[in-house]
């Protein structure tokens, strides 16, 4: 990975994550509680997810976000050391995070209004697109899809762990 890619793409990821999750942490719990009924009526199949999110308080959310931030910081530092497969590991996490930003935009469209995280998703979408394009240009299609799949699977597993951890503390 070039020095400019590290400077413009790798190093900002933890900060972008912090800013995005700060928006979510500030409004998530109150927003879900105040929109729970409307969400359940509009999306009845998502009732278990809505109930789960209703039970995650701000403290639990912040603990979960801190765990995720540690993962991103470790991956970012690993890139800086030039470790084996560090670029692929970081790229997988970046692809998953970029998908997460895109999901917020889709949620806002489906909800037809504000959802927690959508403002920073809009602000950071150019960064995500730049990163996706940079990764796309430096890998094969198969590697790109494999990193995306690994990143998404890791994100799902880690999110479950992070939420569990947040509820325990």
Question: PLM ranges: what are they?
Answer:
Residues 25-54, 169:
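Cytosolic, membrane-interface loops and tails of multi-pass inner-membrane proteins
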Residues 2-29:
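N-terminal signal-anchor transmembrane alpha helix
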Residues 95-104, 115-135:
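Hydrophobic alpha-helical membrane segments
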Residues 1-11, 75-89, 129-146:
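Helix-coil boundary and interhelical linker segments in multi-pass alpha-helical membrane proteins
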Residues 26, 46-66, 107-111:
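Membrane interfacial helix-start motif at the N-side
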Residues 18-25, 97-108, 152-168:
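Transmembrane alpha-helical segments that form the membrane-embedded catalytic/substrate-channel core
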Residues 128-169:
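Terminal transmembrane helical module of multi-pass membrane proteins
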Residues 58-80, 123-129:
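Core segments of transmembrane alpha-helices
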